[in-house]
Amino acid sequence: VFSKRIYKNIETPKVHDIEVFYFDMDYVSGQNFEEFFSTASVNDVEFVVLTLFEYFDTLISTARNVDASNKILKKIDSLKEKTSYPKYIEFLRKYVEDNRIIVPHTFCHGDLTFANIIFHKNRLFFIDFLDCYVDTFLSDLVKLKQDLYHLWAVHNQDVYSVRIHQIYQYIWDKLEVRYESFMNESFHILDAMNALRIEPYLTSERQNVILES
């Protein structure tokens, strides 16, 4: 579906063959996030920022508001048995039950972290799409916050550097300012849900800060 959409400077490798346990797709020349941002120029970083702006602005231009409360409640119920924060789960459930959670309905990548982008000087290649329990660009913003603000992939892959941290902080600040009007209760609910969804993968004190913030 994504490959049929038009986003400025964003592409996805063409998939040729899909089997049960694997798929074949075009080879894409580019760099992972650590390679790219370790040597990125100011212009390279601005290119990434502007390309993300174009992506989200395009999604917003066709958005329509929908009530996502039932889908969120269903997801909350699926997390009950897996969490070490049962009281927080109950708090979230009651909050969603008492308040309609309205989100802008759009396409979303489903797992838009920088680990799922191949970086090129004049292109970003999105890979590893996932189904999203709530189809909204807010879900993509939440995943970017996971990477840019909480430094999830950087710490997970043990490639932290002050340079990358500063670049990520800059990119997230830009996104936060541009989409400030969407950083509302719906965004914060989805953000909290994302932290609970990745809780089983939080294996260190450094990673657990995602749940505590």
Residue map of PLM features:
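Active-site activation/catalytic loop segments of kinase-like enzymes and analogous catalytic loops
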Residues: 139-179, 192-208
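Feature marks short, surface-exposed loop/turn motifs that line or immediately flank catalytic pockets
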Residues: 31-32, 133, 152
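Short beta-strand micro-motifs within the conserved protein kinase catalytic domain, predominantly
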Residues: 13-22
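A glycine-centered beta->alpha junction motif in the catalytic cores
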Residues: 21-42, 189-211
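Conserved kinase catalytic-core helix
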Residues: 2-9, 28-73, 85-100, 105-108
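Alpha-helix-centered segments that form part of catalytic cores
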Residues: 80-106, 166-184
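Active-site acidic catalytic loop and adjacent metal/ATP-binding pocket
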Residues: 93-139
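Acidic carboxylate-rich catalytic motifs and surrounding loops in phosphoryl-/glycosyl-chemistry enzymes
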Residues: 66-70, 183-193
